[in-house]
Design a protein with these regions (language model features):
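Non-catalytic accessory regions of SAM-dependent methyltransferases
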Residues: 1-37, 462-474
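Short, solvent-exposed loop/helix junctions and linker helices
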Residues: 10, 84, 263-267
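Long recognition/docking surfaces used for binding and targeting
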Residues: 15-120
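Conserved phosphate/pyrophosphate-binding and hydrolysis machinery centered on Walker-type P-loop NTPases
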Residues: 101, 125-129, 263
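Amphipathic, well-packed alpha-helical segments that form the structural scaffold of globular domains
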Residues: 109-116, 136, 140, 162-163, ...
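Conserved S-adenosyl-L-methionine
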Residues: 121-223, 228-235, 287-290, 296, ...
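A conserved structural/catalytic subdomain of Rossmann-like adenosyl-cofactor enzymes
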Residues: 215-474
Length: 474
């Protein structure tokens, strides 16, 4: 890959490898049609080192077989990476290496990681594998579930959902996997990623999932959401439909009380997901801290109050910065929705209605060597998953559910009444805190006494003129 990237941009090099993996691993009904380029034909063309047409042969195969992306504005578009001149020897070796590879998953994961880093601007990013595994384990998808990722990127959360269920039920899970992505390139990558792994999924044409409500409800929703997304709009607005005054009753069923701000999609995403959940559905999604912590009176605290009133919030987990994408320095929280938190057969043994679990995993990360990059890592992901499972009373097959108890500085279970007393804040660092040491407690008491004394002195200064006036009147 390093040698190839000397001849072409890193993103194009990775897309070329992905395309060749796709050609080599996905069977095609039309492969025996005369005149149609096939993987076997391409592999045979690499045997003659003097043949200078290998680049054209690769481009021909990719153009014919790569999945076209249906865009409502541009029509069907095949995004074929350009094979640069001077790379014939490397391309020939690459085709042969891919043909002989026994395990493609590690190469596929590395390509997706490199591609995410190369496109780490704005909302073009893919979910790291360790974070995807944490999100899926928190959602607990089951065989037969309908799973949606409305911002699917490379399809990593759909891949992980399939793996999670496959590991528990064996071959051929019957779940339905649906993804949608705004960017044509990412949409094509998602199709190839799933197809190379032999996973059946429906990747919808590119578009903004927020434009309209989801047409169907889903049992599981997973999303590594864009933070503070601007420039989103409902479909009637993008098509020049009539605008309504802010005071008008909302027509969109996703926002039953007040429409979200058009300049920031955070609240819109939360309500879009909540509206798309089936009656016993669960959702796990990443959201910027401010949606959990803002206390200034306004629509955000009111939204949190409604979510808690509906008993939809199951857990909020504070994560470190830069574990959800290579360029995302903003600290995020992982939100877990559950429309049925009751104890029941096939689920957990603890009735958690009217309760929320807060996990403070802000420092749970591994620093990658010689880099600013971080990752959760397997150990930290497992700690979070184990804590949530214990709180739910949820056990793996054949084992008893682990016990749960609050752990200062790590986790705390709170009632909705307690949360209401904190102005409906959902910030884990406000609840799962370390106990104060004796010195810290003493210092805090001194500071409180100083503030009270200053307030009393201010009151005395305000009263002094009135006292003097009263004395003169005697």
């Amino acid at each position: 890959m390093t040698q190839l990237s000397r001849h072409m941009p890193v993103s194009d090099a990775n897309r070329l490898v992905l395309g060749l993996l796709y050609l080599s691993r996905v069977p095609r009904a039309a492969a025996t049609t005369p005149g149609v380029p096939t993987w076997a034909w391409l592999l045979n063309r690499t045997t003659d080192p003097r043949d200078a047409s290998i680049r054209a042969d690769v481009s021909k195969c990719l153009a014919h077989w790569l999945p076209a992306v249906e865009d409502r504005d541009a029509g069907a578009t095949s995004l074929v990476p350009t094979v640069p001149s001077g790379s014939d020897r490397l391309v020939r070796a690459l085709v042969r290496a891919i043909a002989s590879a026994q395990q493609v998953a590690p190469l596929l994961d590395q390509c997706l990681s490199d591609l995410s880093a190369a496109h780490a601007d704005g909302d073009k990013y893919f979910t790291p594998v360790d974070l995807a595994r944490l999100m899926v384990s928190a959602a607990v998808p089951r065989d037969g579930n309908r799973v949606l990722d409305p911002v699917c990127g490379s399809g990593g959360l759909l891949v992980e959902s399939h793996r999670y269920v496959h590991d528990r039920v064996g071959l051929h899970p019957t779940m339905s996997l649906v993804g949608k992505e705004r960017h044509m390139l990412s949409s094509q990558v998602a199709r190839m990623n799933l197809a190379v792994r032999g996973i059946a999924a429906q990747i919808l044409p590119p578009g903004d999932s927020l434009a309209v409500p989801e047409p169907e409800q889903h049992d599981i929703i997973l999303a590594n959401l864009p933070f503070n997304q601007s420039g989103w709009a409902r479909e009637e607005e993008t098509q020049g439909g009539p605008s309504r005054p802010a005071s008008a009753a909302p027509l969109d069923p996703r926002w039953p009380e007040e429409p979200p701000s058009p300049g920031n999609a955070n609240a819109a995403w939360i309500q879009h997901i909540a509206h798309a959940l089936a009656p016993k559905g669960r959702a796990v999604f990443l959201m910027v801290d401010t949606m959990a912590s803002t206390r200034k009176a306004g629509p955000i605290p009111r939204l949190r109050e409604r979510l808690l009133r509906d008993d939809l919030v199951e857990s909020v987990i504070a994560l470190p910065a830069r574990v959800s994408g290579p360029s995302r320095d903003t600290t995020p929280c992982l939100w877990v929705f559950n429309k049925d938190k009751s104890a029941r057969p096939g689920w957990g043994t603890h009735d958690r209605r009217g309760q929320v679990l807060f996990i403070n995993a802000r420092n749970a990360y591994e620093q990658l060597p010689n880099s600013r990059a971080r990752r959760l890592g397997e150990k930290n992901s497992a700690s979070i998953s184990t804590t949530l499972a214990a709180w739910r009373g949820l056990a793996e097959a054949g084992s008893a559910p682990p016990p749960y108890q609050d752990e200062p500085g790590w986790s705390r279970s709170c009632t909705v009444t307690e949360i209401a007393a904190h102005e409906y804040s959902l910030m884990p660092t406000s609840y799962a805190v370390e106990p104060l040491s004796r010195e810290q407690d003493t210092r805090g008491r001194v500071e409180r006494l100083k503030r009270e004394l200053m307030e009393r002195l201010e009151e005395m200064r305000d009263l002094e003129p009135r006292l003097l006036d009263a004395l003169e009147e005697l």
